[in-house]
Each structure stands twice: as C-alpha cells, then as structure tokens.
C-alpha cells in the first residue's frame, strides 16, 4: 500500500519541487530615492512592486531605431544589475512589460514620466533623450543582485 501511495504522490511532488526550483527564492525591491530628485512623485495606491523576471519584455515603438537601441541598452543594464535576461520587442504587451514611449507634447524634450504599477512600467520621455534619462533613474533604482536567483522589483509609484 505504501508503494502504491508513493507512486501516486511522486509525480506531483516532483512537479512542485521542479516548479519552485526554477523560480527566484525571494524578491528584492529597489528604491527610487534618486538624485536629482524628480519634480513630482506620486505614491501608488497599490504598493505591490513591479517584478522583473525572465518573462518581462521591454517594449519600444516600432520603426524607431533609436528607441530600439535604448531598449537594448536597458536590457543590458537589467542583465548586469540583476542577472535576469529580459526580452526586447516592438510588439505591444500590456502586462509584465517595461514600455518605452516618446510624447513630444510633454513640454521639455529631456523630461520624462515614470509610472510603475505591479503590471507594468511606463516610461514616457519628451524625446528619445528623455527616455534615456528615465532609464538612468531605473538603473539607479535596481537592486544589485547579479545571480538571477533573487527577483528584482521596482516600487510602485509615479514620477515626473
């Protein structure tokens, strides 16, 4: 009877062990207390952080080669800081995405707005340079992990 019970439980137990071994054991949240201070910081209602993992995608505007290079630059930063490889794409994605966008009506071409929710990060710059400066803020906020065994997270908030 014990062998029969063990043979039924073994596949399920193996699946649980395999699933938990492939996921980061913990999450380390970075902090957005950066210098220079943003003009405005709005704390999010939901304090759940945005978690960066292997399924995270950096999305850039299609046909914008400068933004493609900027997205690759951010992916390299994330890999160096956290050990996690993220994808880069020009295809829209609404969840687990870092979305880079340009809005020339923002007023200042080197300004940017950074909105972080548990589902996505939206970085909008007044120009490609503004997006680049916003990436510097993300870079400063990322925890240094390097091994990929601990997930990196960004606190939920909005900055301008």
Label each region the model flagged.
Residues 1-31:
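Bacterial Sec-dependent N-terminal signal peptides
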